[in-house]
């Protein structure tokens, strides 16, 4: 008697599966080519099936951002505020480097997503637990800006690859009128996988600026603590 072969069971569609597939599709083809129709084809369903789990493309994008934010490492217990903030920001950066489209989608959102709000709330909590006042925390959150999520808005986009010979010609022309700009533009390239363009190690520059900010925040925190009413230095000064 011939043995019947069972057909493989179809994985049921769920919101999580839809969002993860959206992230994978954006990673492989780019966020510009993402559509509900293409995502449905990728999942082997009709487009209408997606709308049971995401109301529209905007809700899909919000959910995809939450998937990326979910990849950020949780806070490390027992560390000082500076180490905790630095570790999470660099983890956020690694997540965004895995999904290059995510920073543009985050910037396009008019309201933060639930997981993004949870991340921001956690980061604010680290500052507050580290001794920052509400006012100082407010200021440092503005100062650190999008670095909190692992990316920066650059003055000029140098992410496109440039032919070295053409780059040299451009630098020589710049030097005739803008010598200091040319000096920076012609700086020697850094080594490593994070090099962007011809003269900028993006990861190094990101961490350089981040550490400058964190060191500055620590000085402000110390000043605030020593001048706060009830502190030992304030009491000594009032005698």
Per-segment meaning from a language model:
Residues 166-200:
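C-terminal lobe substrate-recognition/regulatory segment of protein kinase catalytic domains
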Residues 17-24, 59-75, 84-91, 118, ...:
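Alpha-helical structural segments
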Residues 1-38, 42-45, 54-62:
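Basic, helix-initiating cap at the start of DNA-binding domains
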């Amino acid at each position: 008697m011939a043995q019947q072969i069972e057909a493989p069971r179809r994985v049921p569609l769920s919101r999580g599966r839809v969002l993860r597939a959206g992230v994978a599709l954006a990673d492989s083809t780019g966020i510009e080519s993402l559509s509900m129709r293409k995502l449905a084809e990728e999942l082997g369903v009709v487009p209408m099936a997606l709308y049971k789990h995401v109301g529209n493309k905007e809700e899909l994008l919000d959910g995809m951002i939450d998937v990326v934010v979910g990849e950020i490492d949780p806070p490390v217990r027992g560390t000082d505020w500076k180490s905790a903030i630095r570790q999470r920001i660099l983890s956020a950066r690694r997540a965004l480097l895995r999904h290059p489209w995510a920073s543009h989608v985050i910037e396009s959102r008019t309201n933060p997503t639930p997981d993004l709000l949870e991340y921001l709330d956690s980061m604010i909590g680290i500052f507050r637990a580290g001794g920052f006042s509400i006012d100082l925390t407010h200021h440092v959150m503005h100062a650190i800006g999008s670095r909190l999520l692992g990316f920066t808005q650059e003055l000029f986009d140098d992410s496109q690859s440039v032919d070295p010979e053409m780059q040299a010609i451009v630098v020589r022309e710049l030097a005739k009128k803008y010598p200091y700009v040319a000096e920076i533009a012609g700086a020697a390239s850094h080594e490593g996988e994070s090099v962007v363009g011809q003269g900028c190690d993006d990861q190094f520059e990101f961490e350089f600026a981040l550490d400058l900010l964190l060191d500055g925040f620590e000085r402000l925190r110390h000043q605030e603590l020593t001048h706060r009413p009830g502190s030992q230095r304030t009491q000594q000064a009032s005698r």
